[in-house]
């Protein structure tokens, strides 16, 4: 797995002419004629935009150096003005040294695109080595900002770009940006017929493009224009053949966090979905607790777990921000404390420095600082996560489903007894999947099917797919009423051995127990022993007096349910394994590119996907898992790099 490198913000100055100047590369960001003029004349005109995106469902632009954002803003403005614009504009940009928010605001202070610049600045992410998803225009314009060295970022991108903005400081100042390897990897991401434009006419730019199959159409004193026309175009890997591209409809089985997140994400890609659940309303099972934690994970190696949950937490914070601000969601993301009794301040700071994450995302608090932040007599120091805390999972699920608008249809109170798929001879008008009720009637049909129904996904998988390897883990939470003698509500959500969060009405939710236990009717009943364990842990956090933790035989409000947990504690997102393809792959000749051809259920006869196994961190994972699933289904650029996509891919179970 790729190890993340710390992100160093740009060192911005001014040239003698007053132009924004990079202290890192010793060059101005744009020519004296102006950044927006260069964007219009070199990049938009050079790639024949906006004409080439007319009538497209999605147009993807790859920019190799985001800089100060002028090219993005000019392209966004052109999209806004164009009555024949594409349905969705995806702008995938890379930057090694992103500007600090204050510098970005200063550069665009008097911009003629002040409205768009203000939106960009308001959405500007923390400088972490991740792929940041910033949505504008209701999701119809998406900036995917990949922060990191281009040599680290390009190998992990999964996209098909129609236009290429080859921007960056001149080859003499930044030769690594214009290396043969960079051009090779850019060509891998280029769609047939993609247009490339650069503000440089150096031989390094021209020759690099020609060697990778580009036809250089025009060069000038300060520009290069080329078209991608390779003599050989490799066949896409099996896992990237999305079925029925013309019929953008999907069935989603399961209306909890995962299913509602999938519906929201599919809607952002222009897909319609039908969400089916056995309960009358969304999130009535394990996703129905009054509150749950939302936070990232940190470790010094910056492992796949840490990278996934950091990216997922940042995306969830952005996704839920509008609902929280409008009072449509219960919860708060004002901060979260994770106790760690193993570390002292010196050790914690050494770990943090090794990864180089910004302190606004993660900081270490010694015991005094942790106690002051939580308002509790905590036993040790803690990691403080900035944009983290708790959300109401049921309310969040409903909010995501509602945000999909007319693109999502809800069918509740209806159990799916069986599925009928392409291999079973389903004969609906799409030739795809049918959900069948217990009477043998068709509930709904679509060319694509997503199983987002937690543990129940195994029951519905076709015979040619192995079980997904999910374990049932029972958990119980306890709700302590406000005003209970000895109760001290935490100022911030806190977790250690157990967790405690203050609900909006002053009640405190504590939990949660963890028991490997099969799903059963009796298990849904609250257990006094589990409540006692929760209260004792709350006392250990300082939320309850030790004597108040003994409630005898009084059963407090609470909830019990089962989590769907994978062995590696990462979700399952993507097509399930196809056993027939797996046997063929293991028994036949080994291909040199076998790693690109996983035995997945994505072909002309399938269109089956999983989004399950979110475990105890469903609130954190759901939204980004939904976006990843939607990328699988629609062919949109993946919202995470290849390593993380592979870490969540159900095909990992075939190894």
UniProtKB/Swiss-Prot annotation:
Residues 1-242 are annotated as: tRNA (mnm(5)s(2)U34)-methyltransferase. Keywords: Cytoplasm, FAD, Flavoprotein, Methyltransferase, Multifunctional enzyme, Oxidoreductase, S-adenosyl-L-methionine, Transferase, tRNA processing. GO terms for molecular function: flavin adenine dinucleotide binding; oxidoreductase activity, acting on the CH-NH group of donors; tRNA (5-methylaminomethyl-2-thiouridylate)(34)-methyltransferase activity. It is found in: Cytoplasm. GO terms for biological process: methylation; tRNA wobble base modification. Disulfide bonds: none annotated. It catalyses: 5-aminomethyl-2-thiouridine(34) in tRNA + S-adenosyl-L-methionine = 5-methylaminomethyl-2-thiouridine(34) in tRNA + S-adenosyl-L-homocysteine + H(+). Its cofactor is FAD. Gene3D superfamilies: D-Amino Acid Oxidase, subunit A, domain 2, FAD/NAD(P)-binding domain, Vaccinia Virus protein VP39. Residues 253-655 are annotated as: FAD-dependent cmnm(5)s(2)U34 oxidoreductase. Its EC number is 2.1.1.61, 1.5.-.-. GO terms for cellular component: cytoplasm. Catalyzes the last two steps in the biosynthesis of 5-methylaminomethyl-2-thiouridine (mnm(5)s(2)U) at the wobble position (U34) in tRNA. Catalyzes the FAD-dependent demodification of cmnm(5)s(2)U34 to nm(5)s(2)U34, followed by the transfer of a methyl group from S-adenosyl-L-methionine to nm(5)s(2)U34, to form mnm(5)s(2)U34. In the N-terminal section; belongs to the methyltransferase superfamily. tRNA (mnm(5)s(2)U34)-methyltransferase family. This is tRNA 5-methylaminomethyl-2-thiouridine biosynthesis bifunctional protein MnmC. It comes from Leptothrix cholodnii (strain ATCC 51168 / LMG 8142 / SP-6) (Leptothrix discophora (strain SP-6)). The gene is mnmC.
């Amino acid at each position: 797995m790729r190890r993340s490198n710390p992100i160093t913000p740009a060192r911005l100055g001014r040239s003698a002419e007053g132009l924004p100047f990079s202290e890192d590369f010793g060059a101005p960001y744009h020519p004296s004629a102006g950044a927006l003029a260069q964007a219009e004349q070199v990049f938009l005109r050079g790639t024949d935009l906006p004409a080439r995106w007319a009538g497209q469902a999605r147009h993807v632009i790859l920019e190799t150096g985001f800089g100060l954002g002028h090219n993005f803003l000019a392209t966004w403005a052109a999209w806004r003005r164009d009555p024949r614009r594409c349905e969705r504009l995806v702008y995938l940009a890379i930057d090694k040294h992103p500007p600090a928010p204050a510098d970005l605001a200063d550069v665009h202070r008097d911009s003629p695109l002040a409205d768009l610049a203000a939106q960009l600045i308001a959405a500007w992410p923390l400088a972490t080595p991740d792929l940041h998803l910033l949505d504008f225009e209701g999701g119809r314009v998406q900036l995917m900002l990949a922060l990191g060295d281009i040599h680290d970022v390009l190998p992990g991108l999964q996209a098909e770009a129609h236009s290429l903005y080859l921007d960056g400081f001149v080859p003499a100042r930044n030769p690594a940006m214009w290396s043969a390897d960079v051009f090779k990897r850019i060509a891998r991401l280029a769609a047939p017929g993609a247009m490339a434009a650069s503000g440089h006419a150096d031989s390094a730019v021209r020759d690099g493009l020609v060697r990778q199959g580009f036809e250089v159409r025009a060069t000038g004193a300060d520009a290069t224009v080329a078209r991608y026309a390779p003599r050989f175009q490799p066949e896409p890997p099996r896992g990237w053949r999305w079925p029925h591209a013309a019929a953008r409809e999907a069935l989603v089985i399961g209306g909890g966090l995962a299913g509602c997140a999938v519906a929201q994400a599919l809607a952002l890609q222009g897909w319609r979905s039908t969400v089916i659940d056995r309960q009358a309303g969304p999130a009535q099972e394990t996703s129905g607790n009054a509150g749950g934690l939302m936070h990232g994970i940190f470790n010094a190696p910056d492992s796949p777990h840490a990278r996934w949950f950091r990216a997922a937490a940042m995306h969830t914070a952005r996704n839920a921000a509008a609902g929280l601000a409008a009072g449509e969601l219960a919860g708060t993301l004002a901060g979260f404390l994770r106790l760690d009794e193993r570390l002292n301040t010196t050790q914690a700071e050494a770990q943090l420095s090794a990864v180089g994450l910004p302190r606004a995302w993660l900081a270490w608090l010694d015991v005094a600082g942790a106690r002051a932040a939580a308002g509790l007599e905590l036993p040790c120091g803690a990691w403080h996560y900035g944009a983290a805390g708790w959300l109401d999972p049921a309310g969040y699920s409903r909010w995501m489903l509602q945000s999909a608008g007319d693109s999502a249809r809800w069918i509740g109170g209806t159990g799916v007894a069986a599925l009928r798929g392409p291999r079973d001879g389903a004969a609906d008008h799409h030739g795809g999947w049918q959900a069948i009720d217990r009477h043998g009637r068709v509930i709904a049909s679509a060319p694509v099917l997503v199983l987002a129904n937690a543990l129940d996904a195994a029951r519905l998988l076709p015979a040619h797919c192995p079980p997904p390897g999910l374990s049932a883990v029972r958990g119980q939470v306890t709700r302590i009423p406000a005003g209970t003698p000895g109760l001290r509500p935490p100022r911030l959500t806190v977790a250690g051995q157990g967790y405690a969060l203050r609900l909006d009405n002053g009640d405190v939710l504590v939990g949660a127990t963890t028991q490997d236990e099969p799903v059963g009717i009796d298990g849904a009943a609250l257990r006094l022993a589990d409540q006692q364990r929760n209260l004792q842990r709350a006392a250990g956090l300082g939320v309850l007096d030790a004597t108040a933790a003994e409630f005898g035989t009084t059963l407090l409000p609470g909830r019990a349910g089962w989590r769907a947990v994978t062995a590696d504690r990462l979700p399952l997102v993507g097509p399930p394994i196809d056993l027939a393809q797996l046997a063929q792959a293991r028994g036949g000749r080994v291909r040199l590119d076998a790693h690109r051809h996983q035995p997945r259920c994505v072909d002309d006869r399938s269109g089956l996907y999983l989004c399950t196994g979110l475990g105890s961190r469903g609130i954190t994972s759901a939204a980004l898992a939904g976006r990843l699933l939607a990328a699988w289904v629609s062919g949109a650029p993946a919202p995470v790099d290849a390593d993380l996509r592979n870490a969540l891919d159900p095909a990992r179970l075939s190894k």
